[in-house]
Amino acid sequence: EIVIETETEAVDESTETADTKSAETATIGGSYVDFDNMQFAINGKTYTLGQTTLQELIDDGVTFNEDDIANASNNLNKNSQSSGFRITLGDYWSGQVYVFNDSDAGKTASECYISEVYLPMHIGETQNVMSCAFPVDMTLYELLANERDPTDNRTYEGESHTTDTVEYKKDSTKYYGQYGYKFEFLDGNLQYITIDYLP
């Protein structure tokens, strides 16, 4: 069996506080946590984890970091996940997508499907590039009111801030590991979103 464990590096490490929250809203309807349709949108077009390839995003004109997208033609070993491909959201602000090769042979990264989306929020700022199937300006309380049974819910209370991590996960049927949704909050405001897929 193969263990797939990828630790995503935060692109945005900002911990600045604000009473305001992002005014963004979802462009895709439905449940906040939907394992049958793990979707995200870029520039208003909807894509699905486990189905959409990196090449489709390239063909649609998604603006990637030049250094990252130069690796799209590189070979990705079987049963492997790529490094992140950064998508510019604003000044010093990037989302990331990752691809996964679940075949028995090497493939180029561009041929592989999107397996993970990472979206950091800048509290008090908005962007119109990436969105999800839920309001990305929701609070911790709004998430828990809509999705009542998280797999894991952790709270850390520091001297000046409180962070909460809420996860909704399922076991992979092919690999040893879990996949799903992770929401990270700072003082109740959504700060990081990670959606990852495993077959």
Locate predicted features.
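N-terminal, intrinsically disordered, polar/charged segments of Gram-positive cell-envelope systems
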Residues: 1-51, 55-61
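A cross-family detector of function-defining hotspots
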Residues: 19-26, 55-107, 134-199
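Periplasmic/extracytosolic POTRA-like scaffold domains at the N-termini of outer-membrane
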Residues: 34, 45-51, 130-137, 145-147
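Short, recurring structural edge motifs at helix starts
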Residues: 40-46, 128-132, 168-171, 180
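A motif-centric signal for short, conserved binding hotspots located
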Residues: 102, 107-129, 193-194
